[in-house]
UniProtKB/Swiss-Prot annotation:
Disrupted gene: phenotype observed: Mice are born with the expected Mendelian distribution and appear normal at birth, but fail to thrive, become dehydrated and die after three to five days. They develop skin atrophy and die due to a lethal intestinal epithelial dysfunction. The colon is shortened and swollen and presents signs of acute inflammation. At the time of death, about 80% of the colonic epithelium is detached.
Family matches, as InterPro entries: Band_41_domain, FERM_2, FERM_central, Kindlin/fermitin, Kindlin_2_N, PH-like_dom_sf, PH_domain, PH_Kindlin/fermitin
Lineage: Eukaryota, Metazoa, Chordata, Craniata, Vertebrata
Region (Disordered): 157-181
Skewed-composition ranges (Low complexity): 169-181
Record gene name: Fermt1
Species per Swiss-Prot/TrEMBL record: Mus musculus
Record-linked Pfam families: FERM_M (PF00373), Kindlin_2_N (PF18124), PH (PF00169)
Domain PH: 377-473
Single GO cellular component term: cell junction
Name the UniProt record assigns to this protein: Fermitin family homolog 1
CDD domains (UniProt xref): FERM_B-lobe, FERM_C_fermitin, FERM_F0_KIND1, PH_fermitin
Annotated keywords: Cell adhesion, Cell junction, Cell membrane, Cell projection, Cytoplasm, Cytoskeleton, Membrane, Phosphoprotein
Length: 677
């Protein structure tokens, strides 16, 4: 039997630093412990020895050397590997964090620094009333963004005072009750479906939320357009490599903030990371739709995504319209049934476009798949000649296009048959120039087969473009999303029509806009202010009757129709290659892009992926596809874990369905994205 002296010799001293509330200086507590003492016992000893009456329930032990939390309170010190030289910190798990939202507003709230980022983001979104938190994540600003900000502050004569929405009283504790209104399927709208005004009757749902006290319209309403000076001072990517650098800062969703060296009160960005916006609904998504609109708006203004001048003017007109409606003091707190129906119709179209599921449950007659047949012009850039554009008779059926010398030869062998499943579809449209083109990038063994189709008018273009988009996803024109896609394309083309009318001239005289605030700096430099304003007002004529929420949805849909939409770029080096390439990650595919020319080289579909993994020793991502195709690459602009998580994240999001009642399989997410490091 051991004597008391033996017991004393088996124990040892453990020094623990303690964080105190209200910014008081840390204190060091020395405990006498033994290896069989569990973590909960250590914390109990600490509290008893300090003898300070306060709530210690949020405190936990953080191990500095191992950079990990000791959250399994039933584990012993021996099992954890804690010895006398361990540097332990007894600190709150929830700390203040500043989050810059997509609308450029900063909120300050209490966030769990011990939960994995995936869970922390879900809790943050509950506080902010944003559904589908799995689409968002936290981004550490790039060094280029920070340098621009510091330079601006240095050159400023006055101190920069940031407008912060302080939600300090809120807690994102995982166990805290959340208002059922956030996820209720039967609740009435949380805000007016037309003008976006929060409905007073619904504010009772958020009685415990700090947003009630601080006017949640700050998050649900769009912000005024930024001044040209503000735009000029912000970081704008000039190349695909610059865009790749912007995506290096995504946090690891499988690790906590503390494990990733995030400090208390540090500023991070909350962003939509995955471009699959599921189940958007104006009844419940006031904040979500507005933040999505704001992220799209800033992406256009800062040229994070390329668009034509014609498209830029459409975006400017929609911004102008949304800004006017948002600032209108006479907005009424009611909506007519017809107005609600308009928004629901716009939403239904948007939902189909964004892969949110079918618009209705009507069973299609799949025994008779529709076909398109018409004369179109064909152009192949690789056979570059002055008269390379030639007219053929085209037949579109299933997911393939065949073309013939003329209509009479349709029953014979086609000149060529193009299978569009898995191809890239790029619009090439200039409405004012009567140019309606469709660029097809079709994957072949040695890269991409580039083909241009030229249509004669809007209706023809809308039908063929919609068919191409569906075929690229493996769907036919029998799918219920075909007609909404056609309508959506026609609607967007209608917005692009220029209207030079006396009304525009009179509006110009009473102009209340600064046009340079509504377009990118590069676009603003090309035109005089009055000329730019006139063109924006011409475009505005086509959207002037839109309700506020529909205008935001149209902006999102126009953003979604841009060729670069949904692509996240990374600088990589493919195995066996001697030069760097850009890897584009989208919701359903990977694209290898030439870093110099920006031209897509090869596309690989997730649907054809058999497996992917990471060699953590050499930080190399390896992916195996059908037909014995395999690729491997190292990431140069970011950690390979970020790209690995993007691939797994998109596959995870593809498993969502409306029947799930918004419950997420968090274990599946970590299984697909966590890796084996």
């Amino acid at each position: 039997m051991l004597s008391s002296g033996d017991l004393t010799s088996a124990s040892w001293e453990l020094v623990v630093r303690v964080d105190h509330a209200n910014g008081e200086q840390q204190t060091e507590i020395t405990l006498r412990v033994s290896g069989d003492l569990h973590i909960g016992g250590v914390m109990l000893k600490l509290v008893e020895q300090m003898n300070i009456a306060q709530d210690w329930s949020d405190y936990a032990l953080w191990w500095e050397q191992k950079r990990c939390w000791l959250l399994k309170t039933h584990w012993t010190l021996d099992k954890c590997g804690v010895q006398a030289d361990a540097n332990l910190l007894f600190t709150p798990q929830h700390k203040m964090l500043r989050l810059r939202l997509p609308n450029a507003k900063t909120v300050r709230l209490r966030v769990s620094f011990s939960a994995v980022v995936f869970k922390a983001v879900a809790d943050i979104c509950k506080v902010l009333n944003i559904r589908r938190p799995e689409e968002l994540s936290l981004l550490k600003p790039s060094s280029d963004y920070c340098k621009k900000k510091k330079k601006k502050e240095k050159n400023s004569k006055e101190p920069v005072i940031e407008d912060i929405l302080n939600l300090e009283s809120s807690s994102t504790s995982s166990g805290s009750p959340v208002s059922p209104g956030l996820y209720s399927k039967t609740m009435t709208p949380t805000y007016d479906p037309i003008n976006g005004t929060p409905a007073l009757s619904t504010m009772t749902w958020f009685g415990d939320s700090p947003l009630t006290e601080q006017n949640c319209s700050v998050l649900a309403f769009s912000q005024p357009p930024p001044s040209p000076d503000v735009l000029a001072d912000m970081f704008q990517p000039r190349s695909l490599v610059d865009k790749a650098k912007m995506n290096a800062g995504w946090l690891d969703s499988s690790r906590s903030l503390m494990e990733q060296s995030i400090q208390e009160d540090e500023q991070l960005q909350l962003r939509f990371k995955y471009y699959t916006f599921f189940d958007l609904n104006p009844k419940y998504d006031a904040v979500r739709i507005n933040q999505l609109y704001e992220q799209a708006r800033w992406a256009v203004l800062l040229e994070e995504i390329d668009c034509t001048e014609e498209e830029m003017l459409i975006f400017a007109a929609l911004q102008y319209h949304i800004s006017k409606l948002s600032q209108c003091a006479e907005i009424q707190d009611f909506a007519t049934k017809s107005e609600v129906d308009e928004v629901e119709a716009a939403l239904s179209s948007l939902e189909v476009t964004l892969e949110g599921g079918k618009a209705d449950n009507t069973l299609e007659d799949i025994t008779d798949i529709p076909k398109l047949a018409d004369y179109l012009k064909l152009f192949r850039p690789k056979k570059l000649m002055l008269k390379a554009c030639k007219q053929y008779w085209f037949v579109f059926k299933d997911t393939s296009i065949a073309y013939f010398k003329n209509k009479e030869l349709e029953q014979g062998e086609p000149i060529e048959k193009l299978n569009l499943r898995g191809c890239e579809i790029v619009p090439d449209v200039n409405v004012s120039g009567r140019k309606f083109g469709i660029k097809l990038l079709i994957p072949v063994a040695d890269g991409m087969n580039e083909v241009y189709l030229r249509c004669d008018h809007e209706d023809q273009y809308a039908r063929w473009m919609a068919a191409c988009i569906l075929a690229s996803k493996g769907k036919t024109m029998a799918d219920s999303s075909y007609q909404p896609e056609v309508i959506s394309i026609l609607s967007f083309l209608k917005m692009k029509n220029r209207n030079s009318s006396p009304l525009v001239a009179s509006s110009l005289e009473n102009m209340d806009m600064n046009p340079e605030c509504l377009v990118s700096p590069c676009c603003a430099k090309k035109h005089k202010s009055k000329q730019l304003a006139a063109r924006i007002l011409e475009a505005h004529h086509n959207v002037a009757q839109m309700p506020l929420v529909e205008a935001k949805l149209q902006f999102i849909q126009a953003w979604q129709s841009l060729p670069e939409f949904g692509l996240t770029y990374y600088l990589v080096r493919f195995k066996g290659s001697k030069k760097d390439d850009i890897l584009g990650v989208a919701y359903n595919r990977l694209i290898r892009i030439d870093a110099v020319t920006g031209i897509p080289v090869t596309t690989w579909r997730f649907a054809n992926m058999k497996q992917w993994n990471v060699n953590w020793e050499i930080r190399q991502v390896a992916i195996e596809f059908d037909q014995n195709v395999s690729i491997a690459f190292t990431c140069l602009s970011a950690d390979c874990k970020i790209v690995h998580e993007y691939i797994g994240g998109y596959i995870f999001l593809s498993t969502r369905s409306k029947d799930q009642n918004e419950t997420l399989d968090e274990d599946l997410f970590h299984k697909l994205t966590g890796g084996q490091d």
